[in-house]
Amino acid sequence: MDKSISLRMMFCNVICTFLVILRHSLNLRAFFISETPANWNAIVQNGSMNITSIAVPFFFLMSGFFFFKGVDATYKDTINKIKRRCKTLLVPFLVWGAINTIILQVSDSCRYGLWDGLLFTHLWYVRDLLFFVLFTPFLAFLRNKATFILYLVLIALAILWQPVDSVFPSSEGMFFFTLGCTLRQNVLLRITCHSSMVFLVMLWLIIPFVYPIGQTIVWQKVYIFSGVLLLWILSQKMPQDINRLIKTVAPYCFFIYCAHLYVLKAIKVTLASMFRNNDAISLACFFLIPIIVTVLLLGIGVFLKKHCHTTFALLTGFRNLQYLKKNESTIL
């Protein structure tokens, strides 16, 4: 695979991992129990939810692309890749599902069932990805023998796509995973950054704070799809310093993604109970807690990899070794 594509995917992987954490940092209900405010704090946090909505679609897109790596694959190659995905996805899905179940049962066993920690937490992304991988032999056949039908399937999935959909199976996940499986390396390489893109990026960032995107599904789809495209375009202009930082953080993205939710929630709920109905603290926590959680879990990940390698391998589905060898994204 072209090294520039792998490097750009790493950049997008790190950005999207942080966006997921930022999305879960929404704290209006935690700080304001009786009535959610309708002020600048709410506008910033709710508007930011639209920006973060590109993260999971990009994860699915990236996972689909890396399955075929932009080239045609034989039936045998596809089956072998499914077996490898079962190792890198099913193992951490079960391990983290067990951890989530224990946390939920200890915190509130009356509210949560035994299966909730496995099926209905932020691991829904991994759950759906495992399901979508089963359809890759069919997608491989269409890629190789019936491209026109594959395009028709994509159009149908785009129509059926419900934005920010985590219900099994996710229509959003299916569309972007199939799109990723369809993309070829030469197409991604042709999407380059021009000076005019700066204006489009600024416009894209401002829109959700002045226009209620979520009221119309069509506009929501356009906003998410254009955001995914703009993120890929911007990835071409990484400074060298950012490039080095990305290479350091990327091997731990999957661990951070799986581990962040309850760490973030504990910090958020604790601070909310101490500073109830405080807009300034609420907004500060919204932006600062994701940074704190990311740095904290990055440190824990580095420690586990160095001193508890087997544990870290189980928590990440042994994908870290694959990453070091192939320089691929670790969210797959």
What is each stretch, according to the model?
Residues M1-L332:
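Alpha-helical transmembrane segments and their immediate juxtamembrane cytosolic regions
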